[in-house]
Amino acid sequence: MKTRSKLAAGFLTLMSVATLAACSGKTSNGTNVVTMKGDTITVSDFYDQVKTSKAAQQSMLTLILSRVFDTQYGDKVSDKKVSEAYNKTAKGYGNSFSSALSQAGLTPEGYKQQIRTTMLVEYAVKEAAKKELTEANYKEAYKNYTPETSVQVIKLDAEDKAKSVLKDVKADGADFAKIAKEKTTATDKKVEYKFDSAGTSLPKEVMSAAFKLDKNGVSDVVSTVDSTTYKTSYYIIKVTDKTEKKSDWKSYKNRLKEVILKDKTSDRSFQNKVISKALEKANVKIKDKAFAGILSQYATTSGSSSLKK
């Protein structure tokens, strides 16, 4: 089952321990779950057997985060938003949605709770990120910011072909735009791009190479590897226009705000600090040694010892 964002990586499946924890308030640890000739299996027997498994550890973590964030931010996420996200995912899977849920060990309600918890954490992280919009952070973001650059790009799938095309575009009188349209292997045949340093329309390696060029400059072959398919692509870039960077960071305040918020909300360390503070505020304490380490990734600030035991 695909999750909504990187934040969702910590919220996988609500499995046996979560169910058992819900039941334990109604039954005694000595309650028989299974009976047989000469023996029984009690709630306590089952709990002791499964609690150290990876699935149980993840389930307990999910249950803790769900309870903590629902208590602190529950009114910030409506049932309507959860349903909309759920229905969007269901529509994407089509007729295979039920089987996808089943394979992930989820019920519809369990998945909705997962979505809700993810949204609650996302809200908390976004609110914390807004507090990072200080003048110092704006100035730091400005230092690393490059304004809009216009380029023509040739994408190729083979290195030898890319080297051959590079010779063509660097020949005297070569029409880069014409060659780009003829040679690019991009599925959409797009060759014209505009982007700043916060853009995502092209691989970072390609944008970095473009920023180093002067206007009308042509790059050497730039190779990139797709992190999903591990396929290597090759690019040749020509800069057709460059915007001069203004001296006052306030000229880019709105764009820099987007950059700061995006950097913070996608930073796993920042996310963990936000979660850590929420856990500390809730005074979460682990009473069963079997789960002693499940919150260790969030014990990143002083005073976090209560998250460990």
Curated annotation (Swiss-Prot):
Signal peptide limits: 1-22
> Pfam families of this UniProt entry?
Rotamase_2
Q: How does it sit in the membrane?
A: Lipid-anchor
User: Which residue ranges does the record assign to the PpiC domain?
Assistant: 146-241
Q: Which GO terms describe its molecular function?
A: peptidyl-prolyl cis-trans isomerase activity
Where do we find N-palmitoyl cysteine lipid attachment?
A: C23
Keywords attached to this Swiss-Prot or TrEMBL record, sorted alphabetically, are: Cell membrane, Isomerase, Lipoprotein, Membrane, Palmitate, Rotamase, Signal
Q: What EC number(s) does the entry state?
A: 5.2.1.8
Its annotated compartments are: Cell membrane
Q: Which reaction does it catalyse?
A: [protein]-peptidylproline (omega=180) = [protein]-peptidylproline (omega=0)
Q: Name one GO cellular component term.
A: plasma membrane
Isomerase recorded as keyword? yes
Family classification: Belongs to the PrsA family.
NCBIfam families for the chain? PRK01326.1
UniProt-recorded name of the protein: Foldase protein PrsA
